[in-house]
Amino acid sequence: MSFGLHPWDVAFRPSPPHNLEKKVVPPGADREKSLPSPKEDSDGAREPDSTVDLRKKNKKKKNYQRYAKPPYSYLAMISLVIQNSPEKRLKLSQILQDISSLFPFFKGNYQGWKDSIRHNLSSNDCFRKVLKDPLKPQAKGNYWTVDVTRIPPDALKLQNTAVTRQDLFPLDLAPYILHGQPYRSLERLSANHTRGRTTPRMEPEVQIPVSDPAVSFPMILWNLPTSYSKCVAPNVVAPPSIHPLLLYSNFPSISIYNYLPPPYGSPVYSDRRDLLASGLHPQIPLTPKPPELKNAPSDFPPNKTVFDIPVYTGHPGFLASQSLFSPHLPTATPPLVGYRPSGL
């Protein structure tokens, strides 16, 4: 007896094509499957969440910066804030608040110093508790006072720490605790200390005396450097752009071209000088120059005697200027007449 295949039999169903059975696997999937998850160790066991969170907390860095601890004992700081209060008594919360406002070290997240304050209040006999309600001695909100006669003298002095070398803290708190002097906060002390170091001292202004032009100009003429001077500045080789006489605005208006020769013996420059002088001061006639100087070619080389100024004694301009400067010119020094340096 043979049994036929029915449509619901497994053998009767045709097998699907092979390309539909394959799944598309991206590259690197086998590698990712082989790697353990971050919460699993090498053995495949899953780590607890508390261990992972602990590692994350340890990796985080502290972003706050703590100030240096004040170089005083807790006894001294408690006595300081109590004595600076108007009523000479404070609650525990007020003591903690005043100490944190005076010293920035206690403003951070560090809370261990509050236990030290409580311990010093209860262990030192110089601090006395004033009950807010005598019927409730165990109630909170009591006041604390300080008996200054029971404070050890050494407890108020500056302790030897690394902050002591910065000179920001007083050496002794006794004047502020025993005599009632006001104590400034550390921020003000550091600001004043920094300002005292960085602010420069103002030097008193030195007033330069202003001399008379009529007196100072002859001295300028006699003290001009020459090529034969011992010390000549590097910028005296070139001719000056302005004559020293023109630096004085209040000087009498006498043309310097009437009695000073040009720096170079050029005939073109000499003719222009004569035209300029005659146009400016027609009332002063020009006289001919001495022949020994007029015909001398190139008496003043550019690199030698730029400031060597000869004076014409017979020129009217020189006579006019001599009448102005005669009280100031030295009498022992003769005028330079046709001076010509030797060796040229």
Curated annotation (Swiss-Prot):
Keywords, comma-separated and alphabetical: Activator, Developmental protein, DNA-binding, Gastrulation, Nucleus, Transcription, Transcription regulation
Gene Ontology CC: activin responsive factor complex
PROSITE patterns found in the cross-reference section: FORK_HEAD_2 (PS00658), FORK_HEAD_3 (PS50039)
Domain of life (superkingdom): Eukaryota
Major subcellular location class: nucleus
Region of interest: Disordered: 1-63
Biological processes per GO annotation: gastrulation with mouth forming second; positive regulation of DNA-templated transcription; positive regulation of transcription by RNA polymerase II; transforming growth factor beta receptor signaling pathway
Keyword tRNA-binding: no
Disulfide bonds: none
Motif (Fast/FoxH1 motif 1 (FM2)) on chain: 234-240
SUPFAM superfamilies (alphabetical): Winged helix' DNA-binding domain
Annotated region of DNA binding: 69-165
Ranges of biased composition (kind: Basic and acidic residues): 19-55
Intervals of motif Fast/FoxH1 motif 1 (FM1): 224-228
Assembly and interaction partners: ARF2 contains 2 smad2s, 1 smad4 and 1 fast3 protein. Interacts with the MH2 domain of smad2. The ARF1 and ARF2 complexes are activated by distinct TGFbeta family members; formation of ARF2 is promoted by derriere and vegt.
Protein name according to UniProt: Forkhead activin signal transducer 3
Origin species: Xenopus laevis
Name of the coding gene: fast3
